[in-house]
Amino acid sequence: MLVIWLLLLALLPEPRVPAATASPRAPRDAGGRGGVYEHLGGAPRRRKLYCATKYHLQIHPGGKINGTLEKNSVFSILEITAVDVGIVAIKGLFSGRYLAMNKRGRLYASENYNTECEFVERIHELGYNTYASRLYRTVPSGASTKRKASAERLWYVSVNGKGRPRRGFKTRRTQKSSLFLPRVLDSKDHEMVRLFHTNVRYRESLLKPPSKNQRRRRGR
């Protein structure tokens, strides 16, 4: 079923991305707390992004982005906030960092919110979403402005079959690695969130850099 849907999706034209507009002042936070986006309303959606490659997207406090096969990983709990029409910012609840894509198409975890943290959220059939950089894309050279706009290729958030992020310019919206299912938090996730907000030792243990053995066990 997924294969048939992907073939149908490949026939559709690339979505047009709203252009980034200059803001009179830099937002302090994309979550509607004292920033310029508070008028867009509502608390962030707390979700886990489950890729069609079977990995949950993780945002680490050290700046790393990857995927995990763990069902309940603290760094896979995310806050997704609307910052413009069809545009979202994705923040790791436990790491406090934003998902971002640089001009080389690499995903990283940014300490501060900036335009590289803005992604076009597109909801597809079967419940899968795609997230494309608002700022960066592949634009063909040597073509007219009108043809360039129609031939632009978006750069997507993508996690491959080994849990590693793919560079944006190598991605396509029809690839399994670019499809994400937003999952609501389960009871264990909610308990981890509660401990994070109420237990100082628990919070400090999570934010402490992992040892070599811990990194080896996490693997992904």
From Swiss-Prot:
Its main location: secreted. It comes from the Eukaryota. Glycans are attached at residue 66. Pfam families: FGF (PF00167). It is found in: Secreted. PROSITE patterns: HBGF_FGF (PS00247). The keyword Secreted applies. Gene3D superfamilies: 2.80.10.50. SMART domains: FGF. Keywords: Developmental protein, Differentiation, Glycoprotein, Growth factor, Mitogen, Secreted, Signal. One of its GO terms (molecular function) is fibroblast growth factor receptor binding. Residues 1-19 form the signal peptide. Plays an important role in the regulation of embryonic development, cell proliferation, and cell differentiation. Belongs to the heparin-binding growth factors family. This is Fibroblast growth factor 3. It comes from Gallus gallus (Chicken). The gene is FGF3.
